[in-house]
UniProtKB/Swiss-Prot annotation:
Record field: compositional bias (Polar residues): 269-279
Extracellular side: 54-615
SMART domains, sorted: CA (SM00112)
Keyword Transmembrane: yes
Protein name: Cadherin-6
GO biological process: adherens junction organization; calcium-dependent cell-cell adhesion via plasma membrane cell adhesion molecules; cell migration; cell morphogenesis; cell-cell adhesion mediated by cadherin; cell-cell junction assembly; female gonad development; homophilic cell adhesion via plasma membrane adhesion molecules
Species in which this protein is naturally found: Rattus norvegicus
């Protein structure tokens, strides 16, 4: 039997215009009384203001996820204007109209064609209208209604994360918060219990628990130890329908990690350690490493090491390696195998970060014994002192013993030692040492005034092992002996006025002494015995290492005696007494009435070497003569250099002089024999012959020729002078030129005869020599034309 479902109008809408009513009900004949009751109820609501009712509907309800084979019936639309004759047509529009929802245009029945999901769309809004089939006009105004999708429990709870990660400190109290999980249900929370979620724990008990309503996970077991187990995996279930049977559920995984707390003290894996080190290990040398283990991690596993007890706590130290958390035993002081061979230490390891709530577990530290054995090493000799200071008088003779040094082998073998002086510190070999007993003695004489301190180095070397040696500085002080006489501090030269009075101070004397007596210097001054009697001056000793020169008479005559030389004896008071004689020069000068010097023997003051005026004049005269001689010699040499190269026009050598160029002349080729000029032979006729140069040279840059008029005048002047010179050589000489021959555009040059020997010579061939000899051809061609005329 097909069942029809009628949806009743929830409330009537009263309007001044005709209203709609919806007599929707189940299409089952079993509920006529209920429908009449609803219609009556609707009629009674509008007794006071009765108006025409057109539609009797407002909203419909439809269950989601319908699985039937037929269309799902939604409801029926009906208008009061519908008389059942088929004259009205129902039209549906809005959300899903024609697709999800269809309407029977004759009866107004609405059906859903597809399965609907409330989670996708919970409400559909549609519009209904009834029109006249014949006229096509609406008989009622268009009205809007909704279709609500009723929820069913078709969605399981879903957690916000697939996997949760959380941490909680180990040893935490029961009920300590760990993490909160959250699940959501897409069903309608306002309709039944479809969206009411309850949490429960499926895996992770008895360590953790979860609150059913909030999803908060807490610790459920006391004293969970990270060192025993660090990771926990908890599975939480979320179930809807309030956890009742038939509800849907979802699960999630929570990975919980226990974080470390300092609940474990450090522990040494062994109680005793033993190391060895040579006695030569310098301070800071690592000997060995010890390590205590701590089950904690991070800063809770940090360990500090310290030496708390033992006979070697002042000889060794322990430092902590922050990376490896190891204790490094190091040498603190120099070791000596001969003094102590074994040391015992007590080393403690402790945690710097301690949590007071775990002190009940015991002290967070541990200790171990460290035994250190010192190995013997062959050591160099050791001097009895770090440095030696000796003294010796400067008048000590050679081979005088100054003192001694001592060194011995610190090893048990006590190897013998020999001594030597480092000659780099005693280059002059002033001192020497006995290699057997270390006695220091002199090998040269000493002088305190030359060098007060001598700093040398003594070397002690083991005889059996020369590689083992030690050095010690030796400072030798040379003690003073009075072996130097006092002398004037400076050269004294003073003056006295001609009108000086007796007992007048003219100069104060000072003395110095290279010696350095223990009681200080004490000098005495006096005139030399040979000058003490009849002296014109006296010496006054001031008893403070100074003395004054006083005049002994009234007035002095510089014309009679212009200079006085006073020998002064200076003595010291040391033993043996040393003395010296110094000379003070006193000049007699003319002074004004104030005692200021006006004139003395100026030549003596200016020329202290004693040269007279005559000697100076002679020296100046010699210098003048020497300068004149040099000037004359230079002038003669210059005049010789200016002798002409072309002596006369008749010179049959006929040298060609090239200006503004170098090379190619007789001065360069040395063709001219100067010996023939000095010893001329009788002249004889010589035939002229042309020479072809043997060597070829690269062409040179042709210099700019002088003006033709200047060259012609110069040659003419030289020719006239040579023609009148009786000493001109009447012969030709062979001239070899550096630039001529096959490399030249012109042919070879022959000697040009002078006008006195070959006056009738034809120079026309010069025109055939080319453009380079055009100037020469013009010159000699002009001469021929002058002869003809």
């Amino acid at each position: 039997m097909r069942t029809y479902r009628y949806f009743l109008l929830l409330f009537w809408v009263g309007q001044p215009y005709p209203t709609f009513s919806n007599p929707l009900s189940k299409r089952t004949s079993g509920f006529p009384a209920k429908r009449r009751a609803l219609e009556l109820s609707a009629n009674s609501r509008n007794e006071l203001s009765r108006s025409k009712r057109s539609w009797m509907w407002n909203q419909f309800f439809l269950l989601e996820e319908y699985t039937g084979s037929d269309y799902q019936y939604v409801g029926k639309l009906h208008s009061d204007q519908d008389r059942g004759d088929g004259s009205l047509k129902y039209i549906l529009s809005g959300d899903g109209a024609g697709d999800l929802f269809i309407i029977n245009e004759n009866t107004g029945d609405i059906q859903a064609t597809k399965r609907l999901d409330r989670e996708e769309k919970p409400v559909y809004i549609l519009r209904a209208q009834a029109i006249n089939r014949r006229t096509g006009r609406p008989v009622e105004p268009e009205s809007e209604f909704i279709i609500k999708i009723h929820d069913i429990n078709d969605n399981e709870p879903i957690f916000t994360k697939d996997v949760y990660t959380a941490t909680v400190p180990e040893m935490a109290d029961v009920g300590t918060f760990v993490v909160q999980v959250t699940a959501t249900d897409a069903d309608d929370p306002t309709y039944g219990n479809s969206a009411k979620v309850v949490y429960s724990i499926l895996q992770g008990q008895p360590y953790f628990s979860v609150e059913s309503e909030t999803g908060i996970i807490k610790t459920a077991l006391l004293n969970m130890d990270r060192e025993n187990r660090e990771q926990y995996q908890v599975v939480i279930q979320a179930k809807d329908m309030g956890g009742q049977m038939g509800g849907l559920s979802g699960t999630t995984t929570v990975n919980i990690t226990l974080t470390d707390v300092n609940d474990n003290p450090p522990r040494f894996p062994q109680s005793t350690y033993q190391f060895k080190t040579p006695e030569s290990s310098p301070p800071g040398t690592p000997i060995g490493r010890i390590k205590a283990s701590d089950a904690d991690v991070g800063e809770n596993a940090e360990i500090e090491y310290s030496i708390t007890d033992g006979e070697g706590h002042d000889m060794f130290d322990v430092i902590t390696d922050q990376e490896t958390q190891e204790g490094i035993i190091t040498v603190k002081k120099l070791l000596d195998f001969e003094k102590k061979r074994v040391y015992t230490l007590k080393v403690e390891a402790s945690n710097p970060h301690i949590e007071p709530r775990f002190l009940y577990l015991g002290p967070f530290k541990d200790s171990a014994t460290v035994r250190i054995v010192v190995d013997d090493v062959d050591e160099p000799p050791v001097f009895s002192k770090p440095a030696y200071i000796l003294q010796i008088r400067e008048d000590a003779q050679i081979n005088t013993t100054i003192g001694s040094v001592a060194a011995q082998d610190p090893d048990a073998a006590r190897n013998p030692v020999k001594y030597s002086v480092d000659r780099h510190t005693d280059m002059d070999r002033i001192f020497n040492i006995d290699s057997g007993n270390g006695s220091i003695f002199t090998s040269k004489l000493l002088d305190r005034e030359t060098l007060l301190w001598h700093n040398i180095t003594v070397i002690a070397t083991e005889i059996n092992n020369p590689k083992q040696s030690s050095r010690v500085p030796l400072y030798i002080k040379v003690l003073d002996v009075n072996d130097n006489a006092p002398e004037f501090a400076e050269f004294y030269e003073t003056f006295v006025c001609e009108k000086a009075k007796a007992d007048q101070l003219i100069q104060t004397l000072h003395a110095v002494d290279k010696d350095d007596p223990y009681s200080g210097h004490q000098f005495s001054f006096s005139l030399a015995p040979e000058a003490a009697s009849g002296s014109n001056f006296t010496i006054q000793d001031n008893k403070d290492n100074t003395a004054g020169i006083l005049t002994r008479k009234n007035g002095y005559n510089r014309h009679e005696m212009s200079t006085y030389l006073l020998p002064v004896v200076i003595s010291d008071n040391d033993y043996p007494v040393q003395s010296s004689t110094g000379t003070v020069t006193v000049r007699v000068c003319a002074c004004d009435h104030h005692g200021n010097m006006q004139s003395c023997h100026a030549e003596a003051l200016i020329h202290p070497t004693g040269l007279s005026t005559g000697a100076l004049v002679a020296i100046l005269l010699c210098i003048v003569i020497l300068l004149v001689t040099v000037v004359l010699f230079a002038a003669l040499r210059r005049q010789r250099k200016k002798e002409p190269l072309i002596i006369s026009k008749e010179d049959i050598r006929d040298n060609i002089v090239s200006y503004n160029d170098e090379g190619g002349g007789e001065e360069d080729t040395q063709a001219f024999d100067i010996g023939t000029l000095r010893n001329p032979k009788p002249w004889r006729q010589q035939s002229r012959r042309d020479m072809v140069p043997e060597a070829l040279f690269l062409p040179r840059r042709t210099p700019t020729a002088r003006d033709n008029t200047d060259v012609r005048d110069f040659i003419s002047q030289r020719l006239r002078k040579m023609n009148t010179d009786p000493t001109a050589p009447p012969y030709d000489s062979l001239a070899t030129y550096a630039y001529e021959g096959t490399g030249s555009v012109a042919d070879s040059l022959s000697s040009l005869e002078s006008v006195t020997t070959d006056g009738d010579q034809d120079y026309g061939y010069l025109s055939d020599w080319g453009p380079r000899f055009k100037k020469l051809a013009d010159m000699y061609g002009g001469m021929d034309s002058d002869k003809d005329s």
